[in-house]
Amino acid sequence: MSRHPTVKWAQRSDWVYITVELPDAEDVKLKLEPEGKFFFSATSGASKTLYEVDLDLLDSVDVNESKASVSSRSVFYLVKKAESKWWNRLTKPEGKHPLYLKVDWDKWVDEDDEDKGGEGDMDFGDFDFNGLNMGDTDEIGEEVAEEDGDGEGETAAETKEKKIDGEKDEEGVNAKKD
């Protein structure tokens, strides 16, 4: 039997932000269907415990415009709504929502505040959404290598390691002081 990871969500009139909190997720699989069917599964931990989420989203979504990104602590989904409007809840079933489903207050912006430019905490860190299309595949790919100008592709972890070893960061300051 599988377990359910904590799932947080927030929205704008045209997007739904879904964060699955699952550290060290492996074998990540995602299926998103146009009618709003959302399925996630992954394993985590030394015993490779299976975690799954199966949701019927409130309304239709644009699978081709939706994206996903995997980090070491969570899996983030940027789901494009088929119709630009605010949803009064995330899922179709009325009544009590699953205990693992929570509002992401760090990303939440009220409907009235959206026009004022309020974006909440929308810093996605080093998430790389390029090439991650949730509609064409059931699996999320490996970490994409970054170009740092030296012609050699590096993962984000390798780039961070270089900065810690004394290279200058974006502001021209040494990241590590002796």
Swiss-Prot record:
Residues 157-178 have a biased composition (Basic and acidic residues). Induction: Induced by heat shock treatment. Coiled coil: none annotated. One of its GO terms (cellular component) is protein folding chaperone complex. GO terms for biological process: chaperone cofactor-dependent protein refolding; response to heat. The keyword Chaperone applies. Keywords: Chaperone. The keyword S-adenosyl-L-methionine does not apply. PROSITE patterns: CS. Residues 2-91 form the CS domain. Pfam families: CS. One of its GO terms (molecular function) is Hsp90 protein binding. Residues 112-126, 136-155 have a biased composition (Acidic residues). Residues 112-178 are annotated as: Disordered. Acts as a co-chaperone for HSP90. Interacts with HSP90 in an ATP-dependent manner. PANTHER family: CO-CHAPERONE PROTEIN P23, TELOMERASE-BINDING PROTEIN P23 HSP90 CO-CHAPERONE. Belongs to the p23/wos2 family. This is Co-chaperone protein p23-1. The gene is P23-1.
